[in-house]
């Protein structure tokens, strides 16, 4: 019953995504499992530390590609693999981004396998999506299982939008910059997140 109730709430909220390959703009509701995946605080602290380290490494990698190119000169990665990539932008060679940060946000997908360890499945750095679903899913969980949030110290996620805004504002030298989100429009599969 609670699964059905949660799915009704999700439908009423318009939490949908476009189906890949659908030419008619077909959408379906965001898949939602009422059984929470519990991550212990000690595990999360280790994961968070690793994710921060990974972001530093990704930024150092990008900076090297657009500056010294040691990773290419030392043959760690073949040059043609980088230069032929859709994401490589030759005009960025020698560019120094604000605060020295190339990649400000990433959707890093994790999996937990049978040995209990977490592994990175992929780094979504070009156009990370999914956080709006996390925020809304948390609200659905609070409505569906209020007793869980009363009985346990569940870490909040609702501060993410303000943290993202502050991150984006920090890129400007203006005292009170305006931040906007550009979207391809309502037929984009992640439009729910853009809106």
Where do the PLM segments sit?
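Preference for protein termini
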Residues: 1-195
